[in-house]
From Swiss-Prot:
Activity regulation field: In contrast to allele 1, does not undergo autocatalytic cleavage within the FIIND domain and its mode of activation remains unclear. In contrast to alleles 1 and 2, allele 3 is not activated by Val-boroPro (Talabostat, PT-100). Not activated by cleavage by B.anthracis lethal toxin (LT) endopeptidase. Not activated by metabolic inhibitors, such as 2-deoxy-D-glucose and sodium azide.
Function: May act as the sensor component of the Nlrp1b inflammasome, which mediates inflammasome activation in response to various pathogen-associated signals, leading to subsequent pyroptosis. Inflammasomes are supramolecular complexes that assemble in the cytosol in response to pathogens and other damage-associated signals and play critical roles in innate immunity and inflammation.
Site (Cleavage): residue numbering on this chain: F922, S923
CARD domain mapped to chain residues: 1082-1165
LRR repeat placement: 627-647, 684-704
Species assigned in the record: Mus musculus
Name listed for the protein in its UniProt record: NACHT, LRR and PYD domains-containing protein 1b allele 3
Chain spans, region Disordered: 1-22
KW Cell cycle (keyword) present: no
Residues annotated for ATP binding in this entry: G132, A133, A134, G135, I136, G137, K138, S139
GO CC field: cytoplasm; NLRP1 inflammasome complex
Tissue-by-tissue expression: Expressed in macrophages.
Domain spans labelled NACHT: 126-435
Stretch list, region ZU5: 789-922
Length: 1172
């Protein structure tokens, strides 16, 4: 807490400060250049609104000026998370680590979609619950809905009448009739009551703060039909409305802090739940421009906040943002240098009265104010009469001061008073708890009585969710105690007050607490000793529940938490520092990555983008976290500045991280210099996973420089080698030879399974590192490809049986779990078994059925054959984008095409990327999703981009596809492109979800000819022609950029950089070689050595050449050789007399029998094969 400087001195300081700003023109221009264009742009677009509030409502946006504005424009950036599937009413509170996993997931929506069809239920909800933390903006949102409807901008066609009720005011009424209730909900009567009630399906009732009053809204007379003029208790009337006894067709919008509404509304139907997540990054900045009338003050204030990541994160909560702005404004008015060093909401609240309330009122009148707040909280009251104020000892002068400073507000409609915000009332109530002693007026309330009152008010389950309790923890921390002693000029007994915290913790211990609520309390307290003790206790008391996604044997090692907001992420990562049991932290998990589940870990789920401030806080905390050894950020799209901040942490001497997963993080060669600096800095890092990133040759060379440094401790590096040049791969192999401890691996394996007794589809996972240890750390060769099945013993080769039918065979050697990365298929088998897999086309089966009208294809179609009973589970891939870990199986079906017709089977489980069938029966089968036709274009899907190139004499031709992530489609495109000698270039897929039927614009660097420039994302069967854009590059002497943007919003959804080195060999040599084409070797002669060594099935090749190139005598002479290598040598010996046309026939036959070998040789040679 800063001392208030003398006024004269402070004015001098302000003058000096402003003078320095004027003199320092460079800094001043930087400020203006950074903020003025954004401000001017927002002003022109009307995106910096001044929201008008009635005097009786909470004024979080001071109205400096009033003007008409488009309210809907303000809703578009407000983060609203709609839950896909309603929660179990008995488990509506996030109670433990395990129950905090994303059971139902959700998706971001706009305010216009609140009463639209729910993706989970396909029905329009009659009841929408807006939930969220204290001060998150629920009430403001509800009022803006009413105002936007009134101005014709929202729901005007849906509702004829919208009624708004503040439940805190409604609770003051004892009895009301339905007519009186409707009259209260209207500013001005709009129609006779009979006319209003004649169309109940056109009525919307908004009940703000439904959980605030101390009532139970039970439908006590469900069979009794009351007249609209008959008066009854308010809680009974509302209970009848919500219970559908009265106006069953009406619509309702409720706002509430808690999701556990069943105890307040026993007859509550299953609602659509929408969570308000607070201000986005840009909204926090915009708020400062709304609050401060002076533009320069707004810029100065926001710059100060922006420089403090913790303070910026706290501003995610709108009421805290208001608190920060109010404190900064007071400092400006008092001539102080702007300074807010608060790290918690409690510290900010303590700052508020010290700046706004004069010294003369602090000691006595603030205590009376705290008593008023506490009485209101215990009795669920937020409105107070003048007699209530007098009863607590508040004199007129003090009340006038509190009104002037904004601590209290006077309600013009009811001549009553309230605190500026309910959270502020709860803060003062918390102070009252601490200041209480046995002689004060609250019934000789002692320590136990305080705790019992808190439990009675909030309940044991919700105790740590209550702002009053969180403020108590903050006030009883060391900094909180100092702040109160300074505010009240008194001395508090630290030991006695600490005992109160243990009483609160003890009362909740028999019941499973909300883990996130408890973490919030611990964060507010900031006491290291308390944090260490409580977090250590959590290790033994919190165990996973039935929804834990961890595998059954090891699930007690996994703690899982949903962190929807930046604030929750900051709180969780701060507290994890003191959780000694956790060894690995995983953020925003998409899939299980390739590491051991046996290592205790914490999984933080997040569906909304993470701001730079949150990344900075996370990495700062990691510097001092001694227990964490692993960090998994896979699936997060990381900006360069974020990786820069991460690498600064990894280079910090105290950082203990040993394993880092950055799979599919959008990394490019530019990032590799940062990672190389970590490898060269004597860091503790020993394992690094970088698959599914576009690092390129240049990036990997930078990594090699770091690996060569003698202080580098890295022992395992995972990369995608398929896109690297032979020269870079050789460089990596040389590094391995020089450093026996270093293992560089390709092929990303999501799991490596080890069979155990009683193993089911959730087999125990073990890491590559563990397997290496079990094998005695012997050097391992890179074996297998993405087409192989990876199992307990490593890769199992997949055999091509019939190329025309796309029929494959795999012989699984033992019991275990096997996964094929390229197809997404996953089998759990009980014994050795041979499985045949045929790629099928949906059009062969679906076109003649009505299924395509009611269901949408969401995955590939396979015809699988296996011995009955050998396969205990099959995982079938799908491309619906599910952000949660476990989705409902209600709408997903597995379609079986059998002789007698179609069978739709409900999968046992649905997870991101696949469905699970236990003890399956096999036939042509694949995933479908039950839909209504109108929703087909609103299902988020995972997509891929495919780029192919062919080198011509004067130019390069590219083919660019945007298709759903379906291996059968990719295989069909690969085959078609290979016919015309096009070679695929591997680039990362789009990060965002896309939608079937959406259109996208393809663009790129200058001098590119693109036809067509517009692509539609659609699902076409693998037998159908796939849409693509053809791109001509006249002279690719330098890199080119390709982009795909959403046509509607022109938002960038995908970007790739193509360099001349991607088209190997280098283009100048290719261009010159093509001019001398007659002198170039044919493919057959160019790759003689590799073909002799790698062609494994010579007889099928000979059969295709028999009669065309080989006569009977030559055919038998080659077959007479003993080994495949000898047969190929004999064939090449005969080929000396062949013409180019004969060699072309050999090349075509080789493509049909050994397509992957031809593709591999083409890629390594740059795709040039003349005569083919």
């Amino acid at each position: 807490m800063e001392e208030s400087p003398p006024k004269q001195k402070s004015n001098t300081k302000v003058a000096q400060h402003e003078g320095q700003q004027d003199l320092n023109t460079t800094r001043h221009m930087n400020v203006e250049l950074k903020h003025r264009p954004k401000l001017e742009r927002h002003l022109k677009l009307g995106m910096i609104p001044v929201v008008y509030m009635k005097q009786r409502e909470e004024i979080l946006y001071p109205a400096q000026s009033l003007k008409e504005e488009n309210l809907i424009q303000n809703f578009t950036s407000l983060p609203l998370l709609q839950k896909l599937y309603p929660k179990d009413p008995e488990n509506m509170v996030r109670k433990s680590w395990a129950s905090c996993i994303p059971e139902e997931g959700g998706h971001m929506i706009n305010i216009q979609d609140l009463f639209g069809p729910n993706i989970g239920t396909q029905k329009e909800p009659q009841l929408v619950i807006i939930e969220g933390a204290a001060g998150i903006g629920k009430s403001t949102l509800a009022r803006l809905v009413k105002r936007a409807w009134k101005e014709g901008q929202l729901y005007r066609d849906h509702f004829q009448h919208v009624f708004f009720f503040s439940c805190r005011e409604l609770a003051q009424c004892k009895k009301l009739s339905l007519a009186e209730l409707i009259a209260q909900g209207q500013e001005v009567p709009t129609a006779p009551i009979n006319q209003i009630l004649s169309h109940p399906e056109k009525l919307l009732f908004i009940l703000d703060g439904i959980d605030e009053p101390a009532w139970v809204l039970a439908d006590q007379n469900p069979e009794l039909c009351l007249h609209w003029s008959q008066r009854q208790p308010v809680h009974t009337l509302l209970g009848s409305l919500l219970g559908k006894s009265i106006l069953p067709e009406a619509f309702f919008l409720l706002t509430t802090r808690t999701t556990a509404l069943q105890k307040f509304i026993p007859s509550l139907p299953m609602p659509c739940q929408v969570e308000v997540l607070g201000f986005s990054g840009i909204e926090r900045e915009n708020y400062f421009y709304k609050y401060f009338a002076n533009q320069r003050h707004a810029i100065t204030a926001f710059m100060m906040v922006e420089s403090n990541p913790v303070l910026l994160t706290l501003c995610e909560v709108p009421w805290v943002c208001w608190l920060v702005c109010t404190c900064l404004k007071k400092q400006m008015e008092q001539g102080r240098v702007l300074s807010l060093k608060s790290q918690t909401t409690t510290a900010l609240c303590l700052k508020y009265p010290s700046l706004t309330i004069p010294d003369k009122h602090r000691r006595t009148q603030v205590k009376a104010l705290c008593s008023l707040a506490a009485e209101g909280i215990w009795k669920r009251r937020t409105l107070f009469s003048e007699s209530d104020l007098c009863k607590q000892g508040l004199d007129e002068d003090a009340v006038a001061t509190f009104l002037k400073t904004g601590v209290l507000q006077k309600q013009a409609s009811s001549l009553s008073y309230s605190f500026a915000h309910l959270c502020l009332q709860e803060f003062f109530a918390a102070i009252s708890c601490i200041l209480e002693d046995s002689e004060e007026r609250h019934g000789n309330m002692e320590m136990d009585r305080i705790v019992e009152t808190l439990v009675e008010r909030y309940g044991r389950q919700n105790l740590f969710e209550a702002p009053t309790v969180r403020f108590l923890f903050g006030l009883l921390g060391k900094e909180g105690v100092k702040g109160m002693e300074k505010l009240f000029s008194c001395s508090l007994h630290g030991k006695t007050k600490l005992k109160l915290l243990w009483h609160i913790l003890g009362k909740s211990q028999p019941h499973q607490p909300s883990c996130l609520g408890l973490l919030h309390c611990l964060y507010e307290n900031q006491d290291m000793e308390l944090l260490t003790h409580v977090m250590h206790d959590l290790q033994g008391t919190i165990v996973p529940g039935p929804n834990d996604i961890a595998h059954t044997v090891l699930q007690t090692n996994v703690k899982q938490l949903v962190v929807q907001t930046d604030m929750e992420l900051m709180v969780a990562t701060f507290c994890i520092q003191f959780y000694c049991h956790v060894r690995t932290l995983q953020l925003n998990m998409e899939k299980q990555q390739g590491y051991a589940l046996t290592s205790p870990r914490m999984v933080l789920y997040r569906w909304t983008p993470i701001t730079n401030a949150s990344w900075e806080i996370l990495f700062y905390n990691l510097k001092f976290t001694r227990n964490l050894e692993g960090l998994d950020l896979s699936g997060n799209s990381l900006r360069y500045s974020v990786v820069q901040s991460l690498c600064n942490t990894l280079r910090y001497p105290g950082c203990q991280l040993k394993t880092l997963w950055l799979v599919k993080c959008g990394l490019t060669s530019r990032y590799c210099s940062l990672l190389a600096s970590v490898l060269s800095a004597h860091s503790s890092l020993t394992e690094l996973y970088l698959q599914l990133n576009d690092l390129g040759d240049d990036g990997v060379r930078m990594l090699c420089e770091g690996l060569r440094n003698p202080v580098c401790n890295l022992s395992i590096l995972w990369l995608d080698l398929s896109s690297l040049s032979a020269q870079v791969i050789t460089e990596l192999r040389t590094l391995e030879e020089k450093n026996p401890k270093l293992y560089i691996r390709s092929i990303w394996m999501p799991h490596m399974m080890v069979p155990t007794e009683n193993m089911d589809e959730e087999a125990i996972l073990t890491t590559f590192k563990q397997q290496r240890q079990e094998s005695g750390d012997k050097p391992m060769e890179i074996l297998g490809t993405e087409e192989d099945f990876w199992g307990p013993t490593g890769p199992v080769a997949t055999e091509l049986v019939d190329r025309v039918r796309n029929l494959y065979r795999v012989q699984l050697p033992m019991a275990g779990s096997y996964h094929c990365p390229s197809t997404g298929l996953h089998f759990v088998v009980t014994r050795a078994v041979t499985i045949e897999i045929e790629f099928c086309a949906w059009s062969q089966f679906l076109d003649k059925t009505p299924l395509q009208q009611s269901h949408m294809v969401v995955g590939p179609l396979f015809d699988i054959k296996a011995e009955q009973g050998a396969v205990t589970a099959v995982y079938l891939p799908h491309f619906v984008s599910l952000k949660d870990t476990e989705a409902s199986t209600f709408d997903f079906k597995v379609a079986h095409f059998q002789e007698h017709g179609i069978v739709l089977e409900t999968p046992d489980r649905v997870k991101p990327g696949y469905t699970v069938l236990k003890n399956p029966s096999f036939s042509p089968m694949g995933d479908v999703l039950r839909i209504i036709p109108a929703d087909r274009h609103f299902i988020p899907i995972t997509s891929i981009t495919l780029i192919y190139y062919r080198l011509n004499l004067e130019e390069v031709t590219l083919h660019l596809y945007l298709v759903p992530s379906d291996c059968t489609i990719q295989k069909a495109i690969d085959d078609e492109e290979m016919k015309f000698q096009f070679v695929r270039i591997n680039k990362p897929p789009p990060v965002d979800n896309l939608f079937i039927g959406s259109r996208y614009i393809v663009s790129g660097s200058e001098n590119l000819e693109i036809t067509p420039k517009e692509l539609e994302l659609c699902y076409r069967s693998s037998k159908e022609f796939q849409l693509f854009s053809e791109i001509y590059v006249g002279n690719m002497g330098s890199e080119i950029k390709l982009q795909i943007k959403n046509k509607k919003h022109m938002r960038l959804i995908w970007e790739a950089l193509l360099k001349p080195g991607d088209l190997r060999p280098a283009l100048p040599r290719i261009a010159q070689a093509l001019k001398d084409a007659p002198s170039l070797l044919h493919f057959m002669d160019q790759h003689r050595e590799q073909l002799v060594a790698r062609v494994t099935s010579v007889d099928p090749l000979l059969d295709k050449l028999h009669g065309l190139v080989l006569n009977e005598e030559s055919y038998e002479a080659v077959r007479a050789e003993n080994t495949n290598q000898d047969k190929m040598r004999k064939l090449f010996n005969l080929s000396r007399s062949w013409s180019r046309a004969c060699k072309d026939l050999f090349y075509q036959a080789l493509k049909e029998t050994h397509p992957h070998l031809v593709m591999d040789l083409l890629e390594k040679s740059g795709g040039v094969s003349l005569g083919s």
